[in-house]
């Protein structure tokens, strides 16, 4: 059995690496024979043990038992440890060492490491240090460990500061590579190891790399066929696939072994094996354990290759080859890969974070970062890692770019652009279909050509190989022989439109075969590709007999194409949208069953030069196409005759440079007044865009000279480009974006026509240019087939613009031209240029000579939650669906107002477009015509209004299958689709009274039942629109909930617990009612002090089930109604929990499906926190993670048994599992003694100290565990005495925990003050002390009345117990010198009424703030909710008036009118707010001509200074102040003596729409704000207000701090 044929590899002068198949007997024999010992210890993990431990134990025991009896027989011990990176720690090492000591192992022991890289690194380090070093053997079981970590003697453990930071070089005695182990390895793990194999070939051996490039399918096949009866152990039984696999492994190992032999201790050369690891390890530090080591290194290799390209060392050819090779092994090559981008942790991959992690790297020298730089495939720039500045690394890592304006340093520029995309794709198709071998030179290395080659490869249409270091592609044509890809394999084309159109016809050439296991070929693409039209081409092919089905939207990808061959003969094609439809048929026509006559119909043919190019290229490949002529006029007709033939491949075909790409460097010369020469493109070019220089740039004032193969442009002086009155760009449509960018800075108006087809490219390019130019302040006018651009001087353009590129390469490059003269322009999505010019940004700097900087959008954007993930752009438009009459328009208007967006009703849009209402349209043309037109409107809205809109759709949109698919795709990839839900009985009542829309042909309830499932499948969210009044909810509850919901789901302002995100102590209340409405009478008391409220869904029970003994799972409808009801009485975030019986709840453990449905419902309802038990299947958890949007996931584990030990391996295992998925981790055990709480506390302290740790809820249940509830700082679950029961044993109330924290010294008592005079009758102490008492806070608020700001106040604020102070007249200015900093509000208002002590890294800081404006703002928003405020009036010009103007500015009021008796003071105040729209009124009540009267009035003068009587002193208040009648309005009088001032009295007579707010309410509001600023807790305002109300009734002399100012 032990006679195995092995390949031996030498390392450090010893043949210690033995490679083969089924080697366990060989390993046992070799170890026992050559490494005599008293004890052999095999260490493995639980995963590997399940597969291989028994075989090792059996083999060693048999061989030990057969040893001579005369000698002492050695022992064979085994230790199984938990799997995963967490075992590779100081504790993991100590556990193994303790095992060895316990079993009295000595220095002659031999340790065998059986497992992956973690086991090898860890056990190797144990061997290096145990008894000062013992012998060990590596037996790697993963491909990654075989080719990387097991070879070279590196051993290490991880620390919280990084991976492998503590370790030693300790060479194993043997390394046994048993490739049969790979048969049990998941394919993802195999790919993980292939990253290291590709890396080794890339740095050292190009021949090996070529083999890896071309044989990926064979290599994968080698591990997918199990070897029966130990096949492969001997050479005679070894298959060809096994030989290939072994050669790949041995080849990779040999390179590393050679390098290690030369440089064992990594002083230079050994650095090379870290190619891809500098950046890869940084990525891994953030994404571990979800993304594997090899996957991170794969991305790292591409990024480090791009750094080399940026440095001018590696060509784009090399980067492209590396990219393709890694993709062939299913490895990610970009951080945008869905496997990475969909993870919550991906949000943490900021440039700053990655650079910070990269600082701790063993290759570095001090602060200098070192990266292995490739010079070409198979060679490195230096025989060691190279020092690379942070700026270069940051530029590559950044997702956006900024061009620094200036004159190109390399002027005059002379350069060539990449190969033409159009010609490259045509050449690939021609050569693949042709006979013989063709060498393609100057092929474009881009995303587009990569997907084309990959698709042709999948179709088995040709074979591809590289020569000349990748500069030449060798294509061996398949002569038109094509095969259906295997079942389940789709041809994924991304956003490559050219590939999609060409391959559609190519796939019709496929003939069915008995070997096929699929019935058709499926072509698909990304979300935008699925919107781009391909209908005319498909229609033409279908009419010719091809069977092609649209799988989703009609007229778009994906397509299913049956293998029936192309029939031929007569074809008619509409060619007014894309010339690529024509080229697609032309290219494939020779392979039809009959010669083809192709007739183009449907109006003017688009881009004729590109059709001519196709015909010319076909001729080069041996097929002549005849274009018919009119026999009378001799003019060409749009009819083409193509014979049956087979292309004959020319030996070599040189691809012309891309003319569209050439427009960008030429345009840079034009706009910067410099010279640029483009080689390989001139007047002889077949490409239409080659005319750009003569037809556009010359007319704009440039000097243009052109030969047959070269074009030179000299721009006019900067700022002197001329506008072109009109230019028809129909023959060069792609170049219109470049022309548009130049026209923006030209003198005059430019009109561009002939480009209608650009609306259906990668994006709607005409709209994209219009929208993005508007950010610069450039005016444009959209035309039916183009646009007009009104140019502006460069100096007048707005600076610092961030350009959205719509994932469109041409948009990005066009705006990079404009950015060369406009400072601060940020080009988002810089990587979208990889479609046609992957190294554009490098060439811009290296060849043109303009500095390009990377921009990390994460640091530019406002800081978001570290763990939240939004699956869409937060500006993505929201689509509302639902039955007619559910309130979509009502909700949409309020949502749009909240977000400052535009609400767009699809019915109104339809009416404008078709110039008739829906009812009339249906009457004239019927329902089907209406549904078709309605669907087109939906497509148009999604394309045209993709951002900043709330779009309300008609209820019947879901009747159209294509519309449902479009809505589902939008919800999955673009933005929220919200289903507005309303009880059906309310809907019926409303519709029976409504007459503006066509009546249904059937009962409303039947329509509802049919559509309800469709609404559910199309939406990403549900919003319950409750119209009826709910007891204990405020009248404004609906509008407040709409604001909360839409701010949350868009990610604009997620409704998360602020104390949690800021790191302070946080709590949630556990509701235990079967019906939450039972809590509403006491909801304000229940929620005192907490940050969130838990809805225990497993405890819910509808009233009909109260008497039932059996547990009944609550229905989705009941749970939805409970959430909706709770939303109307509290704005606190909801924690949605479905606790199962085994984890202490009531939900059945076996009902996983029902639990997941409820959790999905929570995410659809926009619930903020969703508790997900990690006992659910991983697949279900990942599905929930993918849906969570702005919601956060609490990954929880509960163990009621009392057996869970906080310092045992199980807790760490559960913690790591929860950390993979959760934004917050929750582990709950049961305390058996008080000591268990200290063990818990130590565990929490340890995991919280690691970099990037997540918020952690750790609690022990039971009476003995109450201390853990006090010490827990993250979302502690609390009860309340008013609840019917506690949710868990040992639960405490919020107040009890505060008392305990105080007794433990964790919540010291603080002193708060009111500074001012006179203040004896102030109610501020009552307000704050009542709040402290209710919440159980140990603080005290008192008066400090002094004659001046003197020593007493200085002593108070200097005391360590000082918690904060209110400041009133006359000290609002006098205290400022005592403070360290003022808030922006205090600076703008010019006064301080609040002092807040803040702790910083350098000590304590006193911050002055002003909360007056927040009190005013709160009172306005309470009455007007999210309604936009068109105009407001402020009366007075003192300090309170400043606060009012500041508040109104914060509310984005359209116009602020200011009146004061002393007009000069009013103007003085207006000048203090230069950026606010303040208009001084000469006469009160006289508004500017045509202006709408204000809907907000704030008076800041004493009541005694106002009057409603003529002929009396004071400001006369005219009744026309309250002329506004078009909606809710509010008047605030800051005076509170008397309770009803003349202004408020007048308002009450004005109209029902005017709400009145007395000054006392404002003062209370600003006091509540102060309370929260100081304590971090919301003031229990309802209870405080009740108490104060009683006091003010009983003691009229009690007042607040100040009267209003005159």
Swiss-Prot record:
GO molecular function, one term: shikimate 3-dehydrogenase (NADP+) activity
GO biological process: amino acid biosynthetic process; aromatic amino acid family biosynthetic process; chorismate biosynthetic process
Predominant localisation class: cytoplasm
Region called Shikimate dehydrogenase, residue ranges: 1309-1606
Cellular component annotations (GO), alphabetically ordered: cytoplasm
Keyword Lipid biosynthesis: no
Co-factor remark: Binds 2 Zn(2+) ions per subunit.
Quaternary structure, from the entry: Homodimer.
Protein name (Swiss-Prot/TrEMBL): Pentafunctional AROM polypeptide
């Amino acid at each position: 059995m032990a006679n195995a044929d092995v390949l031996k590899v030498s390392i450090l002068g010893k043949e210690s690496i033995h490679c083969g198949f089924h080697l366990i007997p060989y390993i046992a024999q070799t170890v026992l024979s050559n490494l005599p010992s008293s004890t052999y210890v095999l260490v493995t993990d639980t995963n590997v043990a399940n597969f291989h431990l028994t075989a090792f134990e059996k083999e060693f025991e048999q061989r030990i038992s057969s040893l001579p009896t005369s000698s002492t027989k050695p022992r064979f011990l085994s230790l199984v440890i938990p799997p995963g990176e967490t075992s590779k720690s100081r504790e993991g090492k100590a556990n193994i060492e303790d095992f060895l000591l316990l079993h009295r192992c000595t220095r002659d022991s031999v340790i065998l490491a059986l497992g992956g890289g973690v086991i090898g690194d860890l056990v190797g380090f144990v061997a290096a240090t145990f008894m000062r070093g013992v012998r060990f053997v590596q037996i790697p079981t993963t491909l990654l460990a075989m080719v990387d970590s097991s070879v070279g003697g590196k051993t290490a453990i991880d620390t919280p500061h990084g991976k492998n930071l503590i370790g030693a070089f300790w060479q194993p005695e043997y390394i046994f590579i048993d490739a049969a182990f790979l048969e049990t390895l998941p394919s993802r793990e195999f790919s993980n190891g292939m990253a290291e194999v590709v890396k080794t070939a890339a740095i050292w051996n190009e021949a090996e790399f070529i083999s890896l490039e071309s044989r990926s399918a064979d290599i994968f096949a080698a591990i997918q066929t199990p070897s029966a009866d130990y096949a492969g152990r001997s050479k005679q039984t070894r298959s060809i696939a096994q030989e290939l696999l072994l050669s790949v492994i041995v080849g990779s190992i040999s390179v590393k072994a050679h390098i290690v032999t030369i440089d064992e201790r990594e002083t230079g050369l050994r650095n090379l094996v870290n190619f891809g690891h500098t950046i890869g390890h940084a990525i891994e530090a953030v994404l571990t354990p979800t993304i594997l080591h090899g996957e991170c290194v794969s991305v790292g290799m591409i990024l480090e290759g791009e750094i080399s390209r940026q440095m001018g060392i590696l060509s784009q050819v090399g980067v492209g080859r590396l990219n393709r090779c890694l993709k062939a092994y299913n490895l990610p090559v970009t951080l945008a890969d869905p496997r990475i981008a969909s993870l919550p942790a991906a949000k943490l991959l900021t440039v700053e974070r990655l650079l910070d992690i990269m600082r701790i790297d063993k290759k570095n020298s001090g602060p200098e970062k070192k990266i292995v730089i490739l010079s070409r495939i198979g060679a490195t720039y230096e025989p060691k890692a190279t020092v690379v500045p942070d700026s270069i690394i940051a530029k590559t890592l950044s997702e956006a770019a900024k061009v620094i304006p200036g004159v190109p340093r390399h002027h005059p520029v002379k350069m060539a652009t990449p190969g033409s995309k159009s010609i490259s794709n045509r050449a690939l198709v021609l050569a693949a279909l042709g006979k013989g071998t063709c060498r393609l030179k100057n092929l474009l290395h881009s995303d587009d050509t990569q997907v084309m080659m990959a698709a042709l490869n999948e179709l088995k249409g040709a074979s591809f190989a590289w020569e000349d270091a990748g500069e030449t592609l060798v294509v061996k044509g398949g002569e038109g022989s094509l095969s259906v890809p295997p079942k389940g394999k789709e041809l994924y084309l991304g956003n490559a439109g050219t590939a999609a159109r060409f391959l559609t016809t190519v796939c019709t050439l496929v003939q069915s075969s008995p070997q096929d296991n699929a019935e058709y070929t499926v072509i698909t693409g990304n979300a935008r590709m699925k919107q781009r039209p391909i209908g005319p081409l498909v229609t033409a092919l279908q009419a010719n007999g091809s069977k092609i089905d649209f799988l989703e939207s009609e007229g778009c990808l994906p397509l299913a194409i049956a293998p029936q061959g192309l029939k031929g003969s007569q074809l008619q094609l509409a060619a007014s949208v894309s010339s690529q439809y024509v080229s697609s048929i032309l290219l494939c026509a020779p392979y039809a069953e009959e010669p083809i006559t192709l007739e183009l119909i449907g109006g003017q043919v688009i881009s004729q030069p590109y059709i001519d190019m196709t015909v010319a290229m076909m001729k080069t490949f041996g097929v002549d196409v005849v274009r018919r002529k009119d026999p009378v006029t001799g003019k060409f007709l749009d009819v083409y005759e193509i014979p049956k033939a087979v292309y004959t491949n020319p030996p070599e075909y040189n691809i012309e440079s891309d003319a569209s790409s050439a427009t960008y460097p030429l345009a840079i010369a034009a706009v910067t007044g410099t010279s640029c020469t483009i080689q390989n493109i001139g007047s002889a070019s077949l490409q239409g865009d080659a005319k750009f220089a003569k037809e556009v740039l010359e007319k704009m004032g440039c000097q243009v000279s052109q030969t047959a193969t070269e074009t030179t442009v000299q721009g006019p002086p900067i700022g002197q480009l001329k506008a072109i009155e009109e230019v028809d760009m129909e023959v060069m449509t792609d170049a219109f974006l470049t022309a548009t960018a130049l026209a923006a800075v030209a003198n005059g108006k430019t009109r561009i026509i002939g480009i209608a087809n650009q609306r259906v490219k990668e994006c709607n390019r005409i709209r994209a240019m219009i929208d993005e130019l508007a950010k610069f302040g450039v005016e444009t006018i959209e035309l039916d087939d183009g646009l007009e651009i009104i140019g502006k001087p460069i100096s007048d353009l707005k600076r610092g613009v961030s350009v959205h590129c719509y994932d469109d390469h041409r948009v990005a490059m066009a705006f990079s031209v404009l950015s060369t003269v406009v400072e601060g322009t940020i080009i988002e999505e810089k990587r979208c240029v990889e479609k046609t010019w992957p190294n554009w940004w490098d060439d811009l700097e290296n060849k043109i000579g303009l500095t390009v900087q990377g921009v990390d959008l994460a640091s530019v954007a406002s800081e978001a939650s570290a763990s939240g993930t939004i699956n869409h752009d937060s500006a993505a438009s929201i689509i509302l669906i639902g039955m007619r009459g559910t309130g979509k328009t009502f909700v949409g208007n309020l949502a749009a107002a909240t977000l400052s967006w535009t609400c767009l009703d699809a019915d109104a849009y339809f009416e404008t477009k078709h110039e008739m209402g829906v009812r009339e349209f249906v009457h004239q043309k019927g329902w089907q015509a209406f549904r078709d037109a309605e669907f087109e409107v939906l497509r148009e809205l999604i394309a045209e209004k993709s951002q900043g809109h709330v779009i309300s759709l008609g209820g019947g949109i879901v009747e159209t299958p294509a519309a449902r698919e479009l809505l589902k795709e939008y919800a999955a990839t673009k933005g929220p689709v919200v289903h507005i839900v309303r009880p059906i009985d309310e809907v019926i009542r409303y519709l029976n009274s409504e007459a503006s829309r066509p009546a249904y042909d059937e009962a409303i309830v039947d329509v509802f039942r049919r559509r309800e499932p469709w609404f559910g499948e199309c939406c990403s969210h549900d919003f319950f629109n409750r119209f009826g009044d709910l007891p204990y909810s405020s009248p404004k509850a609906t509008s407040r909930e709409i604001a909360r919901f839409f701010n949350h789901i868009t990610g604009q302002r997620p409704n998360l617990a602020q104390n949690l995100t800021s790191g302070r102590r946080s709590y949630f209340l556990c509701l235990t009612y079967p019906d939450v409405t039972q809590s509403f009478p006491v909801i304000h008391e229940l929620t005192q002090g907490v940050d969130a409220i838990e809805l225990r869904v497993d405890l819910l029970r509808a009233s009909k089930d109260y008497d039932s003994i059996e547990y009944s799972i609550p229905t989705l409808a009941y749970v939805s109604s409970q959430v909706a009801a709770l939303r109307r009485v509290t704005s606190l975030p909801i924690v949605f929990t479905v606790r199962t019986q085994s984890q202490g709840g009531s939900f059945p453990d076996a009902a996983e499906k029902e639990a997941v449905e409820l959790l999905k419902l929570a995410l659809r309802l926009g619930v903020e926190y969703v508790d997900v038990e990690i006992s659910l299947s991983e697949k279900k958890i990942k599905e929930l993670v993918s849906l969570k949007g702005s919601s956060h996931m609490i990954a929880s584990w509960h163990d009621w048994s009392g057996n869970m030990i906080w310092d045992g391996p199980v807790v760490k295992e559960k913690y790591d599992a929860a950390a993979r998925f959760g934004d917050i981790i929750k582990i709950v055990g049961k305390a058996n003694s008080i000591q268990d709480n200290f063990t818990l506390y130590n565990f929490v302290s340890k995991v919280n100290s690691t970099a990037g740790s997540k918020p952690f809820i750790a609690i022990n249940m039971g009476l003995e565990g109450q201390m853990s509830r006090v010490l827990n700082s993250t979302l502690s679950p609390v009860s309340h005495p008013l609840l019917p029961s506690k949710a868990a044993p040992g639960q405490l109330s919020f107040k009890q925990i505060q008392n305990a924290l105080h007794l433990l010294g964790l919540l010291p008592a603080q002193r708060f003050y009111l500074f001012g005079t006179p203040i004896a009758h102030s109610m501020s102490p009552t307000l704050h002390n009542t709040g402290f008492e209710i919440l159980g806070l140990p603080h005290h608020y008192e008066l400090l009345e002094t004659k001046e700001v003197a020593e007493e106040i200085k002593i108070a604020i200097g005391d360590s117990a000082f918690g904060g102070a209110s400041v009133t007249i006359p000290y609002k200015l006098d205290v400022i010198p005592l403070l360290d900093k003022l808030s922006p509000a205090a600076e703008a208002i010019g006064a301080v009424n609040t002092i807040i002590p803040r702790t910083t890294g350098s000590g304590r800081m006193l911050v002055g703030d002003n909360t007056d404006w927040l009190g005013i703002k709160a009172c306005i928003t309470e009455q007007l909710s999210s309604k936009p405020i068109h105009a407001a009036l402020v009366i007075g010009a003192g300090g309170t008036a400043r606060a009012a103007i500041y508040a109104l500015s914060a509310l984005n009021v359209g116009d602020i009118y200011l009146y004061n008796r002393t007009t000069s003071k009013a103007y003085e105040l207006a000048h203090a707010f230069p950026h606010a729209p303040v208009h001084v009124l000469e006469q009160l009540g006289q508004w500017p001509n045509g202006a709408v009267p204000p809907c907000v009035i704030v008076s800041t003068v004493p009541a005694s200074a106002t009057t409603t009587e003529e002929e009396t002193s004071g400001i006369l208040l005219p009744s026309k102040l309250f002329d506004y009648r078009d909606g809710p309005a509010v008047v605030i009088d800051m005076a509170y003596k008397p309770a009803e001032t003349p202004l408020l009295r007048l308002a009450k007579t004005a109209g029902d729409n005017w709400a009145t707010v007395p000054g006392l309410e404002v003062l209370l509001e600003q006091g509540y704000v102060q309370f929260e600023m100081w304590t971090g807790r919301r003031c229990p305002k309802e209870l405080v207000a009740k108490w104060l109300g009683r006091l003010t009734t009983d003691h009229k002399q009690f007042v607040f701090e100040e009267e209003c100012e005159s």
